[in-house]
Curated annotation (Swiss-Prot):
InterPro entries: UPF0145_dom_sf, UPF0145_YbjQ-like. SUPFAM superfamilies: YbjQ-like (SSF117782). Pfam families: YbjQ_1. It comes from the Bacteria. The lineage of its organism: Bacteria, Bacillati, Cyanobacteriota, Cyanophyceae, Gloeobacterales. This is UPF0145 protein gll1048. It comes from Gloeobacter violaceus (strain ATCC 29082 / PCC 7421).
Length: 108
């Protein structure tokens, strides 16, 4: 499965567009609590633990999008967009949602 942020794959013309595919993953409020509890992990303004959780969430979302594309019979996803949203929760905290979307395609 070829995944690309571009709208075309060089040398592989699109034979058919199969539809929009998406994937989402949410980092729960406990991740933020753990993040701030482990503030000592921050080196140079970065937190390895938090970045690891973000990578994990992004991979879950990408895997979900890829699975959806395979179910449509696609062999590629083009125009992939990755977004990060903060979602407020009633208890006053927040969660982070990672969402990905793209167009499932059949390539030649």
């Amino acid at each position: 499965m070829i995944i690309s942020t571009t709208t075309a794959i060089e040398g592989r013309p699109v034979q058919g567009y199969l539809g929009v595919v998406t994937g989402e993953a949410i980092l729960g409020a406990n991740v933020f609590a753990d993040f701030f509890a482990k503030i000592r992990d921050i080196v140079g303004g970065r937190s390895a633990a938090y970045e690891r959780e973000l990578r994990k969430a992004r991979q879950i979302a990408m895997d979900e999008m890829t699975r959806e594309a395979r179910e449509l019979g696609a062999d590629g996803v083009i125009g992939v967009d990755i977004d990060y949203e903060t979602i407020a929760v009633p208890e006053g905290g927040s969660m982070l949602m990672v969402s990905v979307s793209g167009t499932a395609v059949k390539l030649s």
